[in-house]
């Protein structure tokens, strides 16, 4: 669905729910924040450094009649993660959904060149933040039930490459946390699943992938093109709805144009 079009599908059981989307200023997170708002959810929109982009997105959501809270935090710092979740839940008085989307590669570094500092930075941002945000959200989600959706990656299954191996490993952690958390939380009415995007045209690849690397990746996609942020939105909305996916937990939906078929 192009960003300037209203998604025609209305999912009735999403309206009115409070959803926190982390890493939501641009890319997949930004598309999700807008999509949830179009479903009449109340959206907590987290960003780290992209303040202007986040404010533009929040303004667009408000122009469309949506209810949105902007909240800033560095998700490599656990205290920031905790504060963002608490701010969001307390602002709206409740929380029904958490989308753990914040993350990044933080540079392409071969395994032979890894430093302890790089390991800590990547794992804190991509792995620890998911645990911290979920832990803080669980008491709120338990009140009425809800969902957690984690953003993992095609790199979690294919080992990544080109210096992205540690990023892929951090996302493999997230995929397995998704399964374990799903088993623990379903008894409280909290469904946990994940979405694994493939090669998606977002600021992520603008930052970390050269034109040559992108061309090589696209050549491996049967559908013949890289994906867009909006290509990913439907999987998240599907997993957010008890009506559509109430018997689905602990699953990772691969959104990659056939680039990986596990």
Predicted features along the sequence, with ranges:
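Conserved glycine-rich cofactor-binding loop
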Residues: 18, 25-26
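Conserved glycine-rich Rossmann-like NAD(P)H-binding loop of the short-chain dehydrogenase/reductase
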Residues: 41-56
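The beta1-alpha1 cofactor-binding region of Rossmann-like NAD(H)/NADP(H)-dependent oxidoreductases
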Residues: 51, 72-84, 116, 231
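C-terminal substrate-recognition "lid" of short-chain dehydrogenase/reductases
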Residues: 92, 228-255, 260
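Catalytic loop of short-chain dehydrogenase/reductase
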Residues: 105, 147-173, 178-187, 199-200
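Substrate-binding pocket helix/loop in short-chain dehydrogenase/reductase
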Residues: 109-111, 115-120, 217
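A short, exposed helix-loop element centered on a Lys and neighboring polar residues
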Residues: 134-135, 179
